[in-house]
Amino acid sequence: SNVGEKLTAQAQIGELPLDVPMPPSFDEAHAARHISPAYARNASRHCPDKIGFHPLCFCCGVEHEEDGLHVTAAPLRNNEIVAAAWKTQLHWADEAGNVPARFLWTALDCPGQFAFYAGGIRTGMLGQLAARIEHPVPAGDPCVVTGWRIGVQGQRPYAGPAVFDQRGRLCAYAK
């Protein structure tokens, strides 16, 4: 899609082979939330005196108290992964009663950056996202969202985020 003459988004269909690590439990992710950079004061270079890594972000920003997704990932397993206990909301439901795909894609956005941050690497904003939705997530169901570092090619860091349902089933993943 374009804004004026500037390309702002592009999509294509393709394969997405990715080894997705097993998630922690919802309770384990929830217990770690207090160490998430999403709650750190002055964690953002661009929003001084605010709380959070990206305070205004719809996905991870705590400034979106009423309308955000609250995917506040915290480091686990010796900083090898980050995870967030994500409480989806009933009022988000699409016609089938599921979390809309646009919210799943959004939930996959920030955990990759949080994974690099947990490893002591500060990255920029997301530049590219390839995702696959395997199973719908019923609106209102608790989920675990994870992120892990895949590697760096040149100056581009690559991460893998994933969404798991309350049974631990992989519902969506990205790179």
Segment roles from a protein language model:
Residues 1, 9-11, 109-145, 149, ...:
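Hydrophobic beta-strand-centered segment that forms part of the acyl-chain substrate-binding groove
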Residues 2-4, 162-165:
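Core beta-strand residues in small-molecule sensory/regulatory alpha/beta domains
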Residues 8-11, 172-174:
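A structural microfeature
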Residues 12-97:
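Non-catalytic linker/capping segments at the edges of enzyme domains
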Residues 151-153, 167:
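Short, acidic/polar linear motifs in exposed loop/turn regions
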